[in-house]
């Protein structure tokens, strides 16, 4: 195995996992149990280092977790203590001692060996061998340590160590060491049962000033040490402060400018700088009376938002979710005291309350419920927590217009400013989200309000005391997402000229291309005096495109490398860059040609559809016309029927008969003495009327005759069947039969029911 020689130098125990250098005089002798126990007994740096207590938490299972700032041989560490186990994080590069993490996880020897093989195979590790056994071992980068901690289920235990803001590392003095030891002892004996759950693991408590609980920054004074100027004096830390501590301002470690593959480094006291000392005057100068942000804010390196909490590893998940959800159903959001009373310390405020991973803070920020936001932040909700896509509560708030309607975005920034350096899964900041939302219909004014408020807030608070300057924020505006797009590129692509103007006036660069090589000028957005090409634009573009190379392609150059090797390396990089650029341009050109072809086809289809739409609209108009005509005709018919009904009711046929005294059976005669001479047309009209009446009468007579013939035939058959006489002889015998029936009884005494029944039987027999 590739790591065989490496493994021989270390002992992998079942109960402990430590890397210890073998004595030179006994290269093949394994570590004895006594030596291992000695190493475990001295698992902290108490005897050989300066330690300052930071804070303490209680895990869900009741175990206490303590966080210390440690300085050993001039090197700064953060130490997390959990029972008999410790875990160290090195401050300059955020490397973790992986042996301590595995010992904390209680892994077996086989698991330790497998993990060690993977680390050695990757090559991204550092083997430290010094006179301090607590520091010896294999150190791995931040990302890999996080991955291992999650895989072995100790991520939540290490959360205070992982999320601690290294910019807040304290400076050491003898007085602070004495005070920290006293406070640690008091907290260990009296405060464990009253502290918040593990999610609250910061040592600072936001001070209450101004209406939002955030200091303003007018007349701010400069400080030589921005990182240390936000540490509370250790004498002010008590159990109540620890209970109310918030973890939301602890950020991930800064990204290293150079991450080399380091293997074996020997550390000695002579190679490290002595620790800094802080006198009483300097300690008192850490907190001038000038108002400032409660915690420093750095835009030097951006970090990804925290993922949503996993409900499978959470206790009382459903209880926390139900209580937090019920708060949003309460219409009385203005009562902050009532809200804080509902938010008990046992609740997990970061629990997802919907299927998209949104926490209560996301919803409160989106619906602009400021009292609820203040209560959540005061109780320890983490604004760095994202949803399933990595969107923080601040990002979600700019997707709606509620804060524009209430003019409350400035107050929201005072509460959630700690999440400004966070990015989502696509690498986008809140400025990216503002520009993306500006492309939605009706959201342009809201996006401009959010952007201008954010820029004014950043300008107002830019100070060394707050951890950042305006140039850092301008670099933040120029941050590129995973597609290489800056916020200005997105605003130009969606065509919002107002957002483009605001960003460029704030100092955003218009010459940063995305991965496709497109910048602001390529999107057809032109702002006066803004897109003037600088003289060194070519060099700028080359440098910007070079920065888009992934970190894996960057090669670490030894300090004593010869100049010709450097030139050859640079030439290779430029050649590779040019080849990649040409290949990418060819691929993009092919995509553009394909897009043009699809565009032409889509245009033709659109023309055909428009023609069909025109025909359909014409037919629809005609149909509506015809329907209206039909409606008019039906109305006219109803009116005519109504008039006819009225005439029929007023018609008196008896009056006509009486006046005329006509006999219906009288023959038609022509009055020859009629003095009125009718015209030929009138006579023809009367003749035609008589002919029509005659035709109708003839037709009616024929129908009656045919019907009577059928009836006669049926009756003849009935009589034939009843009398047993041939049907052809019935007519001749009918008179005799009639006399016989009449003589059978008196007139009117014939049983017609029997006759009807008899006729029915005859009919069925015929069928």
UniProtKB/Swiss-Prot annotation:
It is found in: Nucleus. Residues 29-44, 192-221 have a biased composition (Polar residues). The modification Phosphoserine is found at residue 252. ANK repeats lie at residues 356-385, 483-512. Residues 66-173 form the HTH APSES-type domain. Coiled coil: none annotated. Residues 17-44, 189-230, 542-562 are annotated as: Disordered. GO terms for molecular function: DNA-binding transcription activator activity, RNA polymerase II-specific; promoter-specific chromatin binding; RNA polymerase II cis-regulatory region sequence-specific DNA binding. One of its GO terms (cellular component) is nucleus. Keywords: ANK repeat, Cell cycle, Cell division, Mitosis, Nucleus, Phosphoprotein, Repeat. Residues 98-119 bind DNA. A motif (Nuclear localization signal) lies at residues 261-264. InterPro entries: Ankyrin_rpt, Ankyrin_rpt-contain_sf, HTH_APSES_sf, KilA/APSES_HTH, SWI6-like, Tscrpt_reg_HTH_APSES-type. One of its GO terms (biological process) is positive regulation of DNA-templated transcription. Pfam families: Ank, KilA-N. Its main location: nucleus. Major component of the cell cycle transcription factor complex MBF (MCB binding factor, also known as DSC1), that controls G1-S phase specific gene expression. Involved in the control of rRNA production, via interaction with pol5. May be involved in the transcriptional regulation of the cdc22 and cdt1 genes. In fission yeast, two genes, cdc10 and cdc2, are required for the cell cycle control called start, the point early in the G1 phase at which cells become committed to the mitotic cycle. DSC1 contains cdc10 and sct1/res1. Interacts with pol5. This is Start control protein cdc10. It comes from Schizosaccharomyces pombe (strain 972 / ATCC 24843) (Fission yeast).
């Amino acid at each position: 195995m590739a790591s065989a020689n490496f493994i021989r130098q270390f002992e992998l125990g079942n109960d402990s996992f430590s890397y210890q250098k073998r004595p030179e005089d006994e290269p093949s002798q394994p570590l004895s149990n006594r030596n291992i126990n000695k190493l475990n007994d001295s698992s902290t740096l108490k005897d050989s280092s300066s330690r300052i207590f930071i804070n303490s938490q209680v895990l869900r299972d009741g175990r206490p977790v303590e966080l210390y700032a440690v300085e050993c041989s001039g090197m700064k560490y953060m130490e997390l203590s959990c029972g008999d186990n410790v875990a160290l994080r090195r401050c300059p590069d955020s490397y973790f001692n992986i042996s301590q993490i595995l010992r904390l996880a209680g892994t077996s020897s086989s698991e330790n060996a497998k993990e060690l093989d993977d680390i050695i195979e990757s090559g991204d590790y550092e083997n430290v061998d010094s006179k301090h056994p607590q520091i010896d071992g294999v150190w791995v980068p931040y990302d890999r340590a996080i991955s291992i901690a999650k895989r072995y289920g100790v991520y939540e235990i290490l959360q205070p160590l992982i999320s601690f803001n290294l910019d807040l590392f304290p400076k050491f003095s003898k007085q602070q060491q004495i005070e920290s030891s006293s406070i640690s002892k008091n907290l260990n004996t009296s405060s464990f049962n009253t502290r918040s759950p593990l999610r609250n693991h910061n040592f600072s408590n936001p001070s209450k000033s101004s209406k939002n609980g955030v200091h303003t920054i007018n007349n701010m004074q400069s400080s030589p040490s921005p990182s240390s100027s936000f540490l509370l004096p250790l004498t002010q830390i008590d159990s109540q402060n620890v209970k109310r501590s918030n973890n939301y301002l602890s950020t991930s470690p800064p990204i290293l400018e150079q991450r080399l593959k380091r293997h074996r480094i020997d550390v000695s006291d002579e190679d490290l700088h002595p620790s800094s000392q802080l006198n009483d005057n300097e300690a008192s100068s850490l907190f001038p009376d000038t108002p400032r942000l409660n915690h420093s804010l750095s835009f030097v390196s951006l970090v990804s938002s925290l993922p949503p909490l996993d409900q499978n590893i959470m206790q009382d998940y459903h209880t926390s979710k139900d209580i937090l959800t019920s708060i949003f159903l309460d219409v009385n959001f203005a009562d902050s005291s009532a809200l804080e009373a509902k938010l008990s310390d046992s609740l997990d405020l970061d629990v997802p309350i919907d299927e998209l991973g949104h926490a209560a803070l996301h919803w409160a920020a989106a619906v602009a419920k400021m009292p609820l936001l203040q209560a959540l932040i005061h109780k320890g909700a983490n604004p760095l927590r994202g949803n399933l896509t990595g969107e923080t509560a601040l990002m979600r708030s700019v997707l709606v217009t509620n804060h524009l309607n209430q003019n409350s975005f400035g107050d929201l920034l005072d509460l959630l400013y700690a999440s400004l350096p966070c990015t989502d899964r696509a690498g986008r900041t809140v400025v990216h989200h503002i520009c993306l939302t500006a492309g939605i219909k009706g959201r342009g004014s809201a996006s401009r309000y959010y952007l201008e408020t954010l820029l004014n807030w950043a300008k107002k608070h830019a100070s060394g005391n707050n951890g950042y300057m305006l140039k850092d924020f301008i670099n933040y505006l120029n941050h590129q997402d995973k597609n290489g797009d800056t916020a200005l590129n997105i605003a130009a692509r969606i065509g919002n000229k107002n957002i483009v103007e605001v960003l460029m006036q704030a100092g955003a660069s218009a010459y940063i291309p995305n991965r496709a090589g497109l910048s602001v000028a390529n999107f057809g957005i032109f702002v006066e005096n803004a897109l003037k090409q600088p003289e060194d634009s070519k060099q700028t573009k080359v440098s910007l495109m070079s920065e888009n190379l992934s970190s894996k392609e960057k090669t670490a150059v030894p300090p004593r490398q010869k100049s010709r090797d450097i030139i050859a390396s640079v030439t290779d990089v430029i050649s590779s860059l040019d080849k990649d650029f040409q290949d990418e341009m060819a691929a993009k050109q092919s995509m553009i040609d394909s897009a043009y072809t699809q565009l032409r086809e889509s245009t033709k289809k659109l023309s055909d559809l428009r023609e069909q739409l025109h025909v359909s609209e014409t037919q629809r108009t005609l149909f509506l016309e015809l329907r209206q005509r039909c409606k008019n005709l039906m109305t006219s018919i109803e009116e005519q029927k109504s008039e006819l009904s009225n005439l029929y009711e007023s018609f008196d046929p008896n009056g006509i008969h009486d006046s005329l005294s006509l006999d219906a059976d009288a023959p038609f005669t022509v009055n020859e003495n009629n003095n009125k001479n009718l015209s030929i047309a009138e006579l023809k009209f009367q003749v035609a009327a008589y002919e029509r009446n005659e035709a109708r009468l003839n037709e009616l007579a024929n129908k009656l005759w045919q019907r009577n013939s059928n009836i006669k035939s049926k009756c003849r058959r009935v009589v034939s069947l009843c009398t047993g006489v041939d049907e052809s002889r019935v007519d001749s015998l009918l008179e005799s039969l009639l006399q016989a029936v009449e003589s059978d009884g008196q007139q009117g005494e014939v049983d017609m029911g029997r006759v009807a029944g008899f006729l029915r039987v005859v009919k069925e027999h015929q069928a």
